[in-house]
Structures are given as C-alpha cells and as structure tokens.
Amino acid sequence: MKVGITFSAFDLLHAGHIGMLREAAENCDYLIVGLQTDPTIDRPDTKNKPVQTLVERYAQLNALKFIDEIVPYQTEQDLLDILELFQIDVRFLGEEYKEDEFSGKDICRKRGGLRKRVVEAENR
C-alpha cells in the first residue's frame, strides 16, 4: 500500500486546497493530512494566526472522503517527528513549493523511498 502525506494549516479551505488534496489522494492508496494547529508558533513574523478554529478546519477536512487520516500537529519539529514515525512513501507539496526547500527534506532523502511530489492545484 502506497501511503502519502501532506501538511498545512488549511485555514479557510478553498478549491485550490481541495484540488491539491484530491490529486494527492489519486496518487496514493492512503492519504494522511497533517493539520497544523497554528503556524505562528514557529513563524510569528511570516505567518498569520488561523481565522478558523482547529475544530472547524478538522471538520472541513474530515468531510472530504478521499482523506483517510488527519493528524494535528503544532510545530515544525512535530512535522519532522511525524515523517520519522509514520511509514510514508510520498510527501505531497502544493505547486507553490516546486522550487522551494521544505521541512523534512533531509528525512525524505535519508529514507530513500520517501520522495517529494508536487501536485498541481486545479479548480475542478
């Protein structure tokens, strides 16, 4: 079974998020979504506090039938711990990260099989 994972705060869930998540789900057998509780914990100068509560964002993601599991996390270290703990085959990133560094890149390289896949967010 091919397990995929993606991470975000998913605040104000929109068609771009849904398109990216659907595309990720179509490219794995089991999709885990890491839901960041508050991006300002690690990056207060570059990120905004979520408008929606964690419960609201979780409920919206949970309504998407192609998501198999939602794992809330707080910090970038938590994200790294999740990548180390779970048996992940592919890490999905939105197209905006195509040329950027991303958290956990070293883990992806170290584990060999875990690779990054950039998915295009289409408004379907």
Residue spans of the language-model regions?
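Nucleotidyltransferase catalytic core that binds NTPs
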Residues: 1-124
